[in-house]
């Protein structure tokens, strides 16, 4: 073997040995050792703990769904027209009866889009300074 090829191979072997786990698992066809049986027991106890947590989570979710189903008829009985108008809501904050579509319609109104170009406000500001954009009058 050439000396210049032996050095990289030796370094790769050392790197592999350094990165390989110390408590690595034996080949599955090999015999069982007490250490492998102990690790399997700890994995089984960990699996049991995860199953216990999963059971608790399922119970909590079913309780929350039952509460939600119990409260759903109460929410259906109140329509938005019956809700009292709250005068204390600030003007800038969206009221509960405002939907997202109404807010988007207000933003797309001709009043808001009067001086907007094709890229949007922020890019139009950049475009007006750099000369890039749709509605830019170039001075030559």
UniProtKB/Swiss-Prot annotation:
Name the UniProt record assigns to this protein: Natriuretic peptides B
Listed InterPro entries: Natr_peptide, Natr_peptide_CS, Natriuretic_peptide, Natriuretic_peptide_brain
Record keywords, A-Z: Cleavage on pair of basic residues, Disulfide bond, Hormone, Secreted, Signal, Vasoactive
Xref: SMART domains: NAT_PEP (SM00183)
Organism encoding this protein: Canis lupus familiaris (Dog)
Domain of life of the source: Eukaryota
One MF term in the entry's GO annotations: hormone activity
GO BP term (any one): blood vessel diameter maintenance
Protein family (similarity comment): Belongs to the natriuretic peptide family.
Record note on modification: The precursor molecule is proteolytically cleaved by the endoproteases FURIN or CORIN at Arg-108 to produce the brain natriuretic peptide 32. CORIN also cleaves the precursor molecule at additional residues including Arg-105, Arg-108 and possibly Lys-111.
Cleavage, annotated site positions: 105-106, 108-112
Keyword Secreted: yes
Disordered, as annotated region: 71-94
PROSITE patterns assigned: NATRIURETIC_PEPTIDE
Subcellular localization(s) per the UniProt record: Secreted
Tissue expression profile of the protein: Brain and also in atria, but at much lower levels than ANP.
Signal peptide interval: 1-26
Disulfide bonds: 118-134
Cellular component GO terms held in the UniProt record: cytoplasm; extracellular space
């Amino acid at each position: 073997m050439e000396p210049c090829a032996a050095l990289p191979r030796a370094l790769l072997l050392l790197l592999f040995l350094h990165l390989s786990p110390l408590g690595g698992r034996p080949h599955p066809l090999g015999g069982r050792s007490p250490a492998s049986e102990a690790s399997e027991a700890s994995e089984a106890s960990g699996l049991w703990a995860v199953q216990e947590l999963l059971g608790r989570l399922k119970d909590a979710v079913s309780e929350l769904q039952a509460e939600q189903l119990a409260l759903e008829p109460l929410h259906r009985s109140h329509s938005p027209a019956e809700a009292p108008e709250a005068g204390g809501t600030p003007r800038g904050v969206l009221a509960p009866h405002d939907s997202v579509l109404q807010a988007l319609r207000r933003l797309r109104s001709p009043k808001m889009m009067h001086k907007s170009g094709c890229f949007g406000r922020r890019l139009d500001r950049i475009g007006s300074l750099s000369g890039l954009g749709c509605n830019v009058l170039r001075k030559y």
